[in-house]
Amino acid sequence: MSEENPCPRNIFLLCKEYGLELEDLRLLCVWCKRPLSEADIWAFAIKELFVVWRKGFPFGACGKCLIAAGKLRQYRHWHYSCYGDTVETETGIPIPQLFMRCYICHKPLSWEEKEALLVGNKRFHNISGRWTGHCMNCGSSCTATDPASRTLH
């Protein structure tokens, strides 16, 4: 590891630092300690999540644990929910310029996803002091298998 950046913060920097291809990277989940599948590693990279370092070793997060962690954070740290115009008033920043993640899967929300929430008159949620919403995948009623497990919509 280089002296200026001893612990790469994302998957791409980790691969660059150690001269690995993404397909060759092997990580364990920081919570369940199981190996991440190739799909989990790609999802972790696409979601722009940070690598967690413990005792000098990098960890990622599997999809199941990310959803569980999101639910736990939602239950423990939900402050309030409101519509987009209120979020803009409170932050002083237009919704398109606010960095937001999906509170379920943690993917950064695209402008299209934020716009769908605004047009659909859906609420944004302040969880752990950060504004969140749901992405098109997690908010889609087509993919909901257990409506009782969905909250904050």
Curated annotation (Swiss-Prot):
Residues in unnamed zinc fingers: 29-65, 102-138
Subcellular location: Host cytoplasm; Host nucleus
Keyword set includes Transmembrane: no
InterPro entries xrefs: E6, E6_sf
Hydrolase recorded as keyword: no
Any one GO MF annotation of this record: DNA binding
Gene Ontology annotations of biological process type: DNA-templated transcription; regulation of DNA-templated transcription; symbiont-mediated perturbation of host apoptosis; symbiont-mediated perturbation of host ubiquitin-like protein modification; symbiont-mediated suppression of host innate immune response; symbiont-mediated suppression of host type I interferon-mediated signaling pathway
GO cellular component annotations of the record: host cell cytoplasm; host cell nucleus
A Pfam entry, by short name: E6
Family matches, as SUPFAM superfamilies: E6 C-terminal domain-like
Keywords: Activator, DNA-binding, Early protein, Host cytoplasm, Host nucleus, Host-virus interaction, Inhibition of host innate immune response by virus, Metal-binding, Modulation of host cell apoptosis by virus, Transcription, Transcription regulation, Viral immunoevasion, Zinc, Zinc-finger
Protein family per UniProt: Belongs to the papillomaviridae E6 protein family.
HAMAP family in the cross-refs: HPV_E6 (MF_04006)
Role noted for this protein: Plays a major role in the induction and maintenance of cellular transformation. E6 associates with host UBE3A/E6-AP ubiquitin-protein ligase and modulates its activity. Sequesters tumor suppressor TP53 in the host cytoplasm and modulates its activity by interacting with host EP300 that results in the reduction of TP53 acetylation and activation. In turn, apoptosis induced by DNA damage is inhibited. E6 also protects host keratinocytes from apoptosis by mediating the degradation of host BAK1. May also inhibit host immune response.
Oligomeric form and interacting partners: Forms homodimers. Interacts with ubiquitin-protein ligase UBE3A/E6-AP; this interaction stimulates UBE3A ubiquitin activity. Interacts with host TP53 and EP300; this interaction inhibits TP53 activity.
Miscellaneous note of the record: Belongs to the low risk human alphapapillomavirus family. The cancer-causing human papillomavirus E6 protein has a unique carboxy terminal PDZ domain containing substrate but low risk E6s do not possess this domain.
Descriptive protein name: Protein E6
Underlying gene: E6
